[in-house]
Regions:
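Rossmann-like NAD(P)(H) cofactor-binding subdomain of soluble oxidoreductases
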Residues: 101-156
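A conserved regulatory-domain signal marking ACT and ACT-like small-molecule sensing domains
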Residues: 305-389
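Helix N-cap at the beta1-alpha1 junction of Rossmann-like dinucleotide-binding domains, i.e.
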Residues: 53-54, 122, 175
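Interdomain hinge/lid region at the active-site interface
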Residues: 229-303, 322
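Internal alpha-helical scaffold of NAD(P)-dependent oxidoreductase catalytic cores
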Residues: 162-248
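NAD(P)+-binding Rossmann beta1-loop-alpha1 motif at the extreme N-terminus of oxidoreductases
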Residues: 2-68, 75, 79, 83
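Rossmann-like NAD(P)-binding element
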Residues: 72-115
């Protein structure tokens, strides 16, 4: 049997079960959340590294990992991570991955097979291209993308449960070693994510439609509000708030995402532009023959698209019955409503909250199975709740 020193780098065995150490490069929202999640899952050997000493220190303070800069020069030189997670911006993720692949390359004399390197950037074509162009050992690189986030950024916004029940896309490529893919997959599963596999082109086309274009549309609509009179904004309901919610996202990050995934985004926007031009042309002459039919068709096409989005637990969309319960804006009132619904044996399929403009009351829109709708309305009303069907 060959000794580790006699084996080539590609022959050194790699463990597809996470044991650590793990190095997280980039201690923002995603990086720090991964650190918190791994440590909560029992992997204590986690280190965080960031170009910002403050961000790195905060990540350590919240428990996301040990600050890499606290290691001595000798310890850093000998450092041999099993996994490196690159949580860098999209425009630099590939270059950082390439550096990590070279820095933590195999050391056959020590039996070290080298680090598996993954990134969590929201685009995947460019990082892979950058790694391949660098000449680094791409067999240990696995692109991945956890589809989770918040409007807030930075390590202070990190949550260990951020990835629970959220999709995590893993992008294999032709030269990657299967055991490296298995390791990254096991990490995603350990963090509670639901793993999906796509190639890098499929990934970028998909996220252009389901994430990047929605961000663009939300920002474009929200920009119309800049000169809107305050009296008009005070009347805004949940429809506008839902549509512009993600417009509060970090502009610096999204500039990088748009630039890195420009072509798939543009291809989707061409279709949106065609439909928008069609709508404008119809509304410019709304009494013309066929105008109302065209408007109805546009709306129906939207209905058809929405109906294809999976429902609860990934199943086919279900038609739920809805009711609205008026809830006083006082401590404990909403909790009492939910507790009483539970006491009545009803299962909530969905819950949406909306605040009433100018009144200390909220509206809880409750979705339930149609078979219990009438009984729940009756029972809640009997308990003194103000229910609107």
């Amino acid at each position: 049997m060959s000794s580790p020193a006699e084996l080539s780098a590609s022959e050194l065995p790699m463990d597809s079960t996470l044991t650590g150490p793990v190095l997280i490069i980039g201690s923002g929202l995603l990086g720090a959340s991964i650190g918190l999640g791994l440590r909560a899952a029992g992997c204590e050997d986690v280190y965080v590294q960031d170009i910002s000493p403050t961000a790195e220190a905060v990540a350590q303070d919240i428990g996301a990992g040990t600050s890499f800069s606290t290691l001595s020069e000798q310890e850093r030189t000998a450092f041999a991570p099993q996994l490196v997670v690159v949580a860098a911006p999209p425009d630099s993720a590939g270059a950082v991955c390439a550096r990590a692949l070279n820095t933590y390359a195999p050391r056959p004399e020590a039996g070290y097979p080298g680090a598996v390197v993954t990134d969590v950037a929201s685009v995947k074509v460019q990082p892979l291209a950058d790694v391949l162009a660098s000449g680094a050992d791409a067999s240990r690189y696995v692109g991945s993308h956890p589809m989770a986030g918040r409007e807030k950024s930075g390590p202070v916004a990190a949550r260990g449960e951020l990835f629970q029940a959220r999709p995590w896309i893993i992008c294999e490529h032709d030269s990657v070693r299967p055991e490296c893919v298995r390791l990254v997959r096991s990490v995603a599963v350990e963090l509670g994510a639901i793993v999906t596999s796509l190639n890098v082109e499929e990934h970028d086309q998909t996220v252009a439609l389901i994430s990047h274009v929605p961000q663009a549309m939300s920002s474009l609509l929200a920009s119309r509000l800049q000169d809107t009179p305050l009296y008009a904004l005070s009347l805004a309901g949940q429809g506008l708030r839902d549509t512009v919610r993600i417009a509060a996202s970090d502009p610096t990050l999204w500039v990088q995402i748009f630039a890195a995934n420009a072509d798939p985004i543009v291809q989707t926007l061409y279709g949106v532009r065609d439909d928008l031009n069609r709508l404008i042309a119809t509304l410019e002459n709304p009494t013309a023959s066929g105008a109302r039919l065209d408007l109805a068709q546009l709306m129906s096409e939207g209905n058809a698209g929405v109906s294809r989005i999976p429902g609860k637990h990934g199943t086919a969309p279900a038609a739920f019955a809805k009711m609205t319960v008026l809830v006083d804006d006082t401590p404990g009132t909403l909790a009492r409503l939910l507790a009483e619904i539970g006491e009545l044996g009803a299962n909530l399929e969905d819950l949406r909250l909306e605040h009433s403009t100018g009144a200390p009351v909220g509206m809880a829109e409750i979705s339930v199975n149609p078979s219990i709708h009438e009984a729940l309305v009756r029972d809640l009303s009997a308990r003194g709740w103000r229910v609107v069907k």
